[in-house]
Amino acid sequence: MSNAYKRVLLKLSGEALMGDDAFGINRATIERMVADIAEVVRLGTQLAVVIGGGNIFRGVAGGAAGMDRATADYMGMLATMMNALALQDAMRHAGIEARVQSALRMDQVVEPYIRPRAIRQLEEGRVVIFAAGTGNPFFTTDTAAALRGSEVGAEVVLKATKVDGVYSADPKKDPSATRYTTITFDEAISRNLQVMDATAFALCRDQKLPIRVFSINKPGALKRIVLGEDEGTLVHV
């Protein structure tokens, strides 16, 4: 079975790294994620990752609590750096070669984000982990995923969440909520479906970059998507 995609951008939330913990990084959870990523890398698909920081600090929450929003967002970017290093370390233990590139310069620790270098590393079979979001406050890591996916020529953004797709309502609160198999960007924006923020949706729509929303907790889901199987929800133009 041939791969449906040559190059993908995987968006991981910081919360996904917590597992069942209330805070931080659950080692067993990150190792399971890396095992799923390893399967995709072995298939020959080029994989880039944008990682959030909500398991450590959320800029939006900091702003809401009275902190200067820009300062809170920069703190959130530093949280993504910690997650990126943890993910790179777990990949190294699994035999996967990975590079971290940061939108904020931290030269003693990771490379700065340089687009041609990122593309070259993907072509050479390395996983590239993009840290620090877009490097600008007021932009989410979902928007960073849309931006980096567009920049490196990904064919799809794979949004890993705790639910197996986009629903008409929150399935945890509304038992009658139904899952969409496919939905357009305009429908998702007009219905205010809180899967990605409107800026990320609009950027992907304008770049004709589809998003597939799937559950990170479903074993083998990432591999099935790369092989072209119908998993989760496809958001398209």
UniProtKB/Swiss-Prot annotation:
Q: Binding positions for UMP?
A: 53, 73, 134-141
Pathway(s) served: Pyrimidine metabolism; CTP biosynthesis via de novo pathway; UDP from UMP (UMPK route): step 1/1
The entry summarizes how activity is regulated as: Inhibited by UTP.
- Catalyzed reaction equations: UMP + ATP = UDP + ADP
* Lineage top rank: taxon: Bacteria
| UniProt xrefs under InterPro entries | AceGlu_kinase-like_sf, Asp/Glu/Uridylate_kinase, Uridylate_kinase, Uridylate_kinase_bac
- List the Gene Ontology MF annotations in alphabetical order: ATP binding; UMP kinase activity
Q: Which HAMAP family match?
A: PyrH_B
Q: What is this protein called?
A: Uridylate kinase
Organism encoding this protein: Burkholderia lata (strain ATCC 17760 / DSM 23089 / LMG 22485 / NCIMB 9086 / R18194 / 383)
